[in-house]
């Protein structure tokens, strides 16, 4: 089988699946937009950092930059899912944490800021935020790493990153402008 044939077969299989995925996502977003599915707000401002493309947009460095600026004036915390960690539930990063316990990116953030910034992981963002507020009632701001698609939490501010590629940028700019 030639590579072109394989590509055509994959195209015919994946295209209908992408339509299904897009339809389900559209219905889900409509349900959030019309308040059928609830968005939870918290007494602490939430900053959500996310991206439009898969991987490689620099979410963690941007999160670190945002946290570095905000931590100068606010008692700041970071909450992440802890991608590829081998643990479950809410875990607060500490000096004994490993990539297996909290994930490599949350550990990187913890090592950069140390005790100045609380860094935690939890696969359930709402539970993680509640736990962070409960354990540290003096927290003034929580930054959610990689949370743009997580609509159950209503952020005060969303920072959206994307790769720079002219066709994509052009489409978005024209759509926003017109």
Give the residues covered by each predicted segment.
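Phosphate/Mg2+-binding loops and adjacent switch elements
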Residues: 83-178
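P-loop NTP-binding module
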Residues: 18, 30, 46-51, 55, ...
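Proline-rich low-complexity regions
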Residues: 16, 45, 61, 106, ...
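Walker A (P-loop) phosphate-binding motif
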Residues: 29-95
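A transmembrane-helix-recognition feature enriched in membrane-embedded lipid enzymes
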Residues: 1-45
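Catalytic cores of large soluble enzymes that bind and process phosphate-bearing ligands
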Residues: 12, 19, 58, 101, ...
């Amino acid at each position: 089988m030639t590579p072109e044939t394989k590509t055509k077969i994959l195209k015919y299989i994946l295209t209908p699946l992408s339509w299904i995925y897009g339809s389900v996502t559209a219905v889900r977003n409509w349900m959030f937009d019309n308040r059928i599915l609830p968005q939870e707000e918290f007494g602490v401002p939430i900053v959500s950092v996310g991206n439009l493309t898969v991987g490689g947009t620099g979410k963690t460095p941007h999160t670190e930059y945002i946290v570095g600026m905000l931590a100068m004036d606010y008692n700041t915390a970071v909450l992440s899912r802890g991608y590829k960690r081998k643990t479950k539930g809410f875990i607060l990063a500490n000096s004994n944490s490993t990539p297996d316990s909290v994930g490599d990116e949350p550990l990187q953030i913890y090592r950069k800021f140390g005790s100045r910034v609380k860094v935690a992981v939890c696969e359930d963002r709402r539970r993680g935020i509640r736990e962070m507020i409960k354990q540290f009632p003096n927290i003034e701001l929580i930054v959610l790493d990689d949370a743009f698609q997580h609509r159950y939490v209503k952020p005060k501010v969303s920072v959206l990153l994307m790769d720079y590629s002219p066709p994509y940028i052009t489409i978005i700019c024209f759509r926003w402008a017109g």
